[in-house]
Amino acid sequence: MTWHPHANRLKTFLLLVGMSAMIVFFGALFGRTALILAVLFAVGMNVYVYFNSDKLALRAMHAQPVSELQAPAMYRIVRELATSAHQPMPRLYISDTAAPNAFATGRNPRNAAVCCTTGILALLNERELRAVLGHELSHVYNRDILISCIAGALASVITALANMAMWAGMFGGNRDGQNPFALLLVSLLGPIAATVVRMAVSRSREYQADESGAVLTGDPLALASALRKISGGVQLAPLPPEPQLASQAHLMIANPFRAGERIGSLFSTHPPIEDRIRRLEQMARG
């Protein structure tokens, strides 16, 4: 079984550098004061999300904590995987929904939570469930919540500066030699570009979690099988496309919405299931 984590890490790094470059560009348009205000706003908002990510996600999914008596298989699998990775045991939750999915959240391994829906517990066999839980634990061990918040903070700065560009374009006229039409164009394209890059970061982290989760369990084909089942199950029982659920979609192991209910692949939080399965099958072949 081969594993090449460096490509995904490099891609994530380059995407974050690209977002930082966009901020420098916007900062050059508006000067230091506007840049500092935008950065302070974005950092403050995302620090809150970072420290409360578990509460926000669990509340959105109406997840309830479960004991070992209530979910013995889930506890046994997670304990085995955490022990093999020399990591603490996370809190375990179940969300009572037929939509087959799972997610992990929490800012570090000591504050982590893993949640499975009743739909995924009914759909998968134990080998596949182990693979899914390995994927979710890998998100925690790879510090993907932190990476997501960094990407979110950068995107928020770009959006805030783009809003300034919009107002400057509409009401600033030609002051300081600024072209109002150029400012309006930047204000439209900036947030779109930031969102595209942020979603690309999310997709890159999914590939990374697939690979590192498969290494943790030693069974990439089980994860491929689970993803195939989950993809079909989501078409039958998707999550409702509500705003509070859409904001947590990037945490799920697979896109929780039925195909066609969300925007195209550039704006998708997850890579195509077919690509993920193909990569896992290649890992298994070595």
UniProtKB/Swiss-Prot annotation:
Cofactor: Zn(2+)
Active site: 136
Annotated membrane topology: Multi-pass membrane protein
GO biological process, one term: proteolysis
Coiled coil: none
Positions annotated to bind Zn(2+): 135, 139, 206
Gene Ontology cellular component annotations, sorted alphabetically: plasma membrane
Pfam families, sorted: Peptidase_M48
Subcellular localization(s) per the UniProt record: Cell membrane
Alphabetically ordered keywords of this record: Cell membrane, Hydrolase, Membrane, Metal-binding, Metalloprotease, Protease, Transmembrane, Transmembrane helix, Zinc
Superkingdom assignment: Bacteria
EC numbers, comma separated: 3.4.24.-
Keyword field contains Zinc: yes
Gene Ontology molecular function: metalloendopeptidase activity; zinc ion binding
Transmembrane segments: 13-30, 34-51, 145-165, 181-201
Disulfide bonds: none
Cofactor: record remark: Binds 1 zinc ion per subunit.
Family named by the database record: Belongs to the peptidase M48B family.
HAMAP family membership: Pept_M48_protease_HtpX
Protein name as catalogued: Protease HtpX homolog
Protein encoded by which gene: htpX
